[in-house]
Amino acid sequence: MSSGALLPKPQMRGLLAKRLRVHIVGAFVVALGVAAAYKFGVAEPRKKAYADFYRNYDSMKDFEEMRQAGVFQSAK
């Protein structure tokens, strides 16, 4: 019995294409995961914080406080 009959022949063609296909799919999945984590972990809370701040923000009150503190030179 020869050793060639015991082991199957290794695949020699398409190794790079197969490896790239697997890794591209993995990279795409990881990229989607990171994008979703950023959106829901950073962007949405930041957007909500800005909305909450500007919902109750009174710019004239803030201006008057700064004017009385002497921040502006031209507004007395």
UniProtKB/Swiss-Prot annotation:
Record keywords, A-Z: Membrane, Mitochondrion, Mitochondrion inner membrane, Phosphoprotein, Transmembrane, Transmembrane helix
Mitochondrial matrix topological intervals: 4-14
Residue positions, PTM Phosphoserine: 74
Topology in the lipid bilayer: Single-pass membrane protein
Pathway involvement of the protein, from the record: Energy metabolism; oxidative phosphorylation
Compartments reported by the entry: Mitochondrion inner membrane
Mitochondrial intermembrane topological intervals: 56-76
A single GO BP: oxidative phosphorylation
Residue ranges of the TM segments: 15-55
Pfam families: COX6C (PF02937)
Function, as annotated: Component of the cytochrome c oxidase, the last enzyme in the mitochondrial electron transport chain which drives oxidative phosphorylation. The respiratory chain contains 3 multisubunit complexes succinate dehydrogenase (complex II, CII), ubiquinol-cytochrome c oxidoreductase (cytochrome b-c1 complex, complex III, CIII) and cytochrome c oxidase (complex IV, CIV), that cooperate to transfer electrons derived from NADH and succinate to molecular oxygen, creating an electrochemical gradient over the inner membrane that drives transmembrane transport and the ATP synthase.
Record note on quaternary structure: Component of the cytochrome c oxidase (complex IV, CIV), a multisubunit enzyme composed of 14 subunits. The complex is composed of a catalytic core of 3 subunits MT-CO1, MT-CO2 and MT-CO3, encoded in the mitochondrial DNA, and 11 supernumerary subunits COX4I, COX5A, COX5B, COX6A, COX6B, COX6C, COX7A, COX7B, COX7C, COX8 and NDUFA4, which are encoded in the nuclear genome.
Name this polypeptide is given: Cytochrome c oxidase subunit 6C-2
Species this chain originates from: Rattus norvegicus (Rat)
